[in-house]
A protein has these predicted regions:
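Glycine-aromatic micro-motifs
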Residues: 1-178
């Protein structure tokens, strides 16, 4: 069974998500309401009335969610949480995302993003056109892929990434709220 997954940090980056779960289908940008993005060494979210977090919505299999669990350190580093992800003003789907555990929050509170991680997140945000809360003055231009990723794994140009874009024809199924 397929599920929606909402990414708000490094998994917004097309290269990163393809490396981790290559069969994920990109749905598009989405927003979760009543949450805010928090910098705790790595991206985190927390409930916050009146706030929103912009990110990217993917359609993934249960097997891919298990793989993401491993990458995210579930259940020790990040816990899984269900959110309502809004695709536009009318369409909302239930999606899984991750939120740091209380122990992780305490250990990482007040610690800034490592530059490499922040640049990976920033590139993903810019690629998808979501609010970029990761970019800092003096950062390299859009398209930065990150050191240590290996040139063989890096897609050259947007044309290759666009081959991966397969929007779903209809989101009105059982998961959609209207």
């Amino acid at each position: 069974m397929n599920r929606f997954y909402f990414a708000y940090g490094s998994n917004m980056n097309p290269d990163r998500i393809r490396e981790r779960i290559p069969q994920a289908r990109l749905v598009g940008k989405a927003t979760i309401k009543g949450w805010r993005l928090v910098e705790r060494l790595y991206a985190d979210i927390e409930c916050a009335k009146g706030c929103t977090v912009e990110g990217v919505l993917y359609l993934v299999s249960q097997t891919e969610l298990y793989r993401l669990d491993a990458y995210e350190g579930f259940p020790n580093i990040y816990g899984s949480v269900q959110v309502n992800a809004w695709l536009d003003a009318k369409h909302c789907v239930n999606a899984q995302t991750y939120m740091m555990t209380a122990t992780t929050k305490a250990a990482r509170s007040g610690r800034p993003y490592p530059k490499e991680y922040r640049l990976i997140c920033s590139t993903g945000a810019e690629y998808h056109g979501v609010k970029n809360e990761f970019r800092r003055e003096g950062d390299p231009p859009f398209g930065y892929r990150g050191e240590g990723w290996g040139d063989a794994k890096v897609r050259k140009g947007a044309a290759k990434l666009d081959e991966w874009w397969h929007p779903l024809p209809d989101l009105g199924g059982g998961n959609a709220k209207r």
